[in-house]
Amino acid sequence: MSQKILIVGAGFAGVWGALGAARVLDGAGVRSSDVEITLISPKPELQIRPRMYEAEPHKMAAPLLPLLDAIGVKYVEGSVDAISVQDRTVSVVSANGQIRSLAYDRLLLTTGSQLSRPPVPGLEHAFSVDRIEDAVELDNHLDKLAKQPASPARNTVAVVGCGFTGIEVATELPKRLREKFGADAAIRVVVIGTQDAIGPDLGPNPRPFVAEAFESLGVEALLGSGVVSVDAGGVRTASGQRIEAGTVIWAGGMRASPLAAQVSSNLDPLGRVEVAPDLRVPEAPNVFVAGDVAKASTDDSGRYALMSCQHAIVMGQFGGHNVAADLLGVPTLTYRQPFYATCVDLGEWGAVYSEGWDRQIKLTHAEGKARKQMINTQWIYPPAPNRAEALAAGNPQASFG
C-alpha cells in the first residue's frame, strides 16, 4: 500500500508545497505508486489574492490541474472541515455536501488566512476583497451603482482599514470609479483607521510616499477612530462621525484558518501555529504547516514571516520539501528567508518598493509601479505545466534569498 502525503489548501503555500514535495520524491526516484501526494481544495485553482484590489477580479485565478498532472500530484475537490492528528485523517466535504475521510502519513496544512470580521453591527453590508468571489461581488455592486443617479453618497466609498490592503484598495478606486461612473464624477474615497498613522505596519520610510499618493489621488484618511457600525448607507465612527457612502469595503486585518487549532494548541494572537524550525508541529510530528497559518522564524534575528504571498511561497517550498523528506527518512531543512521586500501599489500615482525589514526605499512612482506589475503578473504565478520547470520551482533553496 502506498504512503500518503496530504496537502490541505491550494493557496501559495499549498501550490509551492506540492512542487516541493514532488521534487523530493522525483530526486529520490520514488514512484507515485509508492508515495502518493494529494492536494485538497474547493477548486483546482490558485486565487491570486494580492490582486483582488484590481479591476476585473474574475480573471485573478490560475488553473492548477495541468500543473498538478505534470508533477504527478492528485487533486481532490472539497473543503477540509476536520483534522484528527490522533487518527491521521482529514474529513473532506465536497461541493454537493458529500463527506469522506482521507488518511495520511504526513500532512502539510496550508489553509492560509481569512478576513477578520469582528462583531460590528451591520458588517454584513460591507464588501471585501478577501477572495475572488468577494471582489467580484464588489465589482458587480459598483456596476449597479453606475446605473443609479449621481449623488454624493453613490460616489463615496468608505474603506475600513488602513493597512496594506486598505491602502491598495483605496488608491486603485479613483481610477476604477471614474471608469464606471464617468470621467467627471465627483469621486470620494475615505480610508478609516483606528491607528493614528496610515499604514501603521509600514514604518516611517514608505509612509511619506503613501501620504503623497493619497494627496495626489484625492484619497482622504480619517484616522484615530474606528468604525462602530455599518449600514446600507454608510458607516459611523467611534467619534460619532457619520459618513454617507454607497459602498463600504472592510479591510480590517486577517486571521489564520481555524483549522490551525485542530493541529496545535500553541497559537499566536493571529491564530497561527507556532511551528518548529522545519515547520513541523511539535505536538503532532506528522504534521507540517506553511503559509499564513504558520508563525515561523525567518532568520536568527527574531523576525517572523508575515501573512504574505512572498513568505507563503517560500514556506510552501520548505514545507513541501520537509513533509516528503521526513516521510523518506531524509533530514529536513530549517526554514530560512532572510530577504524581505515590500511593494505597495498606489494606484495611478505609481507604487513604492522597499527592501529589508526597515524598508529602505528602492523604487517609487512609475519605477515602483513597473516592479509591482512584474510581481503581480509574473513572479507570484505558478510555473508552466512543464515537469522539469515545475519541479525546479519547488526548490526551497533557490528563490527569494
Which residue stretches match the model-derived regions?
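Beta1-alpha1 glycine-rich phosphate/pyrophosphate-binding loop at the start
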Residues: 1-77, 168-201, 249
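FAD-binding core/adjacent interface of flavoenzyme oxidoreductases
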Residues: 2-3, 73-158, 249
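Internal hydrophobic alpha-helix adjacent to the cofactor/substrate pocket in enzyme cavities
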Residues: 18, 175-178, 310-337
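A Rossmann-like FAD-binding core segment of flavoenzymes
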Residues: 34-36, 71, 75-87, 102, ...
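Active-site-proximal substrate-binding core of FAD-dependent oxidoreductases
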Residues: 34-36, 148-150, 190, 300-305, ...
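FAD-site-proximal beta/loop scaffold in flavoenzymes
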Residues: 124-151, 235, 242-314
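Rossmann-like NAD(P)H-binding beta-loop-alpha module
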Residues: 139-187
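C-terminal auxiliary extensions adjacent to catalytic cores
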Residues: 348-401
